Amino acid sequence: MNFYKLFFGINFCCLQIISRVIKSFQGSTTMKIFEFLISSLRLTVLTCLIFGSGQASAGDRLLATGGVIQLEGAGGGGLNPWALITGYGTDEQIGLSANYAKARTNGGYEIDSGGFGVGFYNRFELSVNQTKFGLNNTVPHESIEMDTVGVKLRILGDAVYDQDNWIPQVAVGVQYKKNEGFSFVPKLVGSQHSNGIDFYIAATKLYLGAIYGRNLLLNANLQATKANQFGLLGFGGDKHDSYSINPAFSAALMLNDNLFIGAEYRTKPNNIKTLKEDDAKDLFLTWFPSKNLSITSAYIDLGNIANKNNQTAWYLSGQISY
């Protein structure tokens, strides 16, 4: 199949997510801003469709330096946003990525996540993502969907090319999340809001040849959020209904030219009286056979979810990039 047809077909399907999200802003200034961003994104996709050749070639950045699309759609690891801009576009190029990921916990919860991101000139990122959370026997045959629209801006440094100093690449980001099933389960267990906005700052540095000649990537985040279980159980709670500052960390080692192994840790708030929420962590292995494709397998520990303790899962993600 022609790479462009596949890639942009996925992107046009994902644009429907944005249409649902911005309905909650009907008539507001925020909606006008979203509509402008969406129009710009559609123009970008159409331009690539018109002028793209049958053989897609990725941008000129180094392999893996766009990361992968994380749970909420930003470029990064599986759990955490990184300061890296998605795709492989340089400061003169536009990069794009689309992915699909699936996990099933030992308690039967299912997580399906898909979305795409566009990186503009290695400076600005726009992402769209939808996550579906299957409730298994907690509420049989039911699921909760969450839509996320995110933006990220690189404000300082270059994670790859600033090797002569200690300064990392630094980016700030915002993620607007809309829980489509709020009145069904989240509200009943004590969640206060159907939508929320997360703010984060990320610092990422790639150390070339740091460990026995292997490249080492380190990342740290600070996130301001009210989300319960990333937003899948709504925002705020009957215990706490204010923003908390939550740190997160990632480390990855490049075993060879196209294989990364790493770990992540993400702290989370604990807002609902009756539902204890634990921090999330993972161990991951990502294979980059080319710039256009990556496959990630991970073991995730999500701790307590709703009425089930010690929830762990194997996670599999596929991504195409340009």
Pin down the residues of each PLM region.
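Cleavable N-terminal export/targeting peptides
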Residues: 1-68
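Detector for outer-membrane/organellar transmembrane beta-barrel domains
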Residues: 191-271, 279-280
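Low-complexity, intrinsically disordered short segments enriched for Gly/Pro and polybasic residues
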Residues: 15-16, 21, 168, 216-220
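Transmembrane beta-barrel domains of Gram-negative outer membranes and organellar outer membranes
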Residues: 58-210, 255-259, 269-271, 276, ...
